[in-house]
């Protein structure tokens, strides 16, 4: 467990791809639920198929009770598969505005614009979830999320300002300069990054388009938001991911952030804060 000013015990379990179970203070969140078995394929458009080559650590039935879902976008199967859609039923879900419309009539789904904040009362605690911008594919919306609650505590930085401790889930995005502004409002105790340098051929053809961060971009964003620790996700076992753990470790070492990285073993709960 890494030292931190974070005041609540936080355990993270990596289920696979961008799916993580966050257990904090008796409340359980899940990110981008993907639960399909190994070698499942999803046609995207003529000539383009996404295939996973790993077995998620959990099935829908073996998940712990989930209090809320942080869904970066609903229109890509590697972030929300059919089992993940079933999980949304009857639960609190934070996602994009467009995604909330497409997931209707689920009453628990809330769509947020970038930098918009929604209150979330769970277990007697008032959480606040702030959406962050993403740049993923040219069409479609995607959000990251910052989660705070008074029980997380605060951190006073070198400028003398006390800011709320927070958990940041990046969603699917490449590096965006705009994201650095979260440092003005929050102290990011833990950042979970969807990385892997995912790349796809655009609908009109041409060179592969980078749609998630590579290691160097992730290291840059990590430094700019002033986060304490980084959990890498979304870099294994899909054909459109182009940078695996070896490449990421090399990039993080070169960028001087490797000592702040927490690698998770699939399916193994880890107390990170």
Which residues fall in each region the model found?
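Bacterial Sec-exported substrate-binding components of ABC uptake systems
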Residues: 1-18
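Metallo-beta-lactamase
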Residues: 2-7, 92-164, 251-273
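Pre-active-site segment of Zn-dependent metallo-hydrolases
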Residues: 2-3, 27-71, 80-86, 137-139, ...
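Active-site environment of divalent metal-dependent phosphoester hydrolases
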Residues: 18, 37-38, 74-80, 100-103, ...
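Divalent metal-coordination and catalytic microenvironments
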Residues: 22, 32, 73, 81, ...
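Structural motif
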Residues: 27-29, 67-68, 92, 127, ...
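Active-site-proximal loop/helix segment associated with metal-binding centers of metalloenzymes
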Residues: 34-45, 49, 127-168, 173, ...
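Cap/insert and terminal regions of metallo-dependent hydrolase folds
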Residues: 94, 98, 174-266
């Amino acid at each position: 467990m890494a030292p931190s000013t974070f005041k609540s015990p936080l355990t993270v379990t990596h289920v696979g791809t961008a799916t993580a179970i966050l257990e904090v203070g008796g409340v359980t969140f899940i990110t981008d639920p993907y639960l399909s078995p190994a070698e499942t394929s999803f046609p995207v458009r003529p000539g383009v198929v996404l295939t996973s080559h790993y077995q998620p650590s959990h099935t829908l039935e073996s998940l712990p009770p989930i209090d809320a879902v942080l869904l970066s976008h609903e229109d890509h199967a590697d972030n929300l598969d059919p089992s993940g859609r079933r999980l949304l039923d009857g639960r609190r879900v934070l996602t994009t505005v467009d995604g909330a419309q497409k997931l209707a009539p689920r009453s628990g789904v809330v769509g947020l614009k970038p930098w918009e904040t929604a209150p979330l009362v769970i277990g007697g605690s008032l959480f606040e979830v702030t959406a962050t911008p993403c740049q993923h594919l040219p069409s479609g919306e995607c959000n990251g999320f910052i989660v705070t609650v008074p029980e997380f505590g605060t951190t006073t930085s070198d400028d003398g300002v006390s800011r709320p401790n927070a958990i940041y889930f990046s969603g699917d995005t490449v590096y965006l300069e705009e994201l650095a502004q979260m440092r003005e409002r929050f102290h990011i105790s833990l950042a979970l990054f969807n990385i892997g340098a995912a790349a796809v051929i655009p609908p009109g053809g041409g060179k592969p388009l980078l749609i998630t961060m590579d290691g160097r971009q992730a290291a840059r964003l990590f430094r700019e938001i002033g986060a304490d620790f980084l959990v890498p996700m979304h870099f294994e076992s899909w054909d459109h991911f182009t940078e695996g753990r070896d490449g990421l470790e090399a990039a993080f070492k070169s960028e001087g952030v490797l000592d702040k990285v927490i690698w998770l073993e699939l399916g193994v709960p880890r107390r990170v804060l």
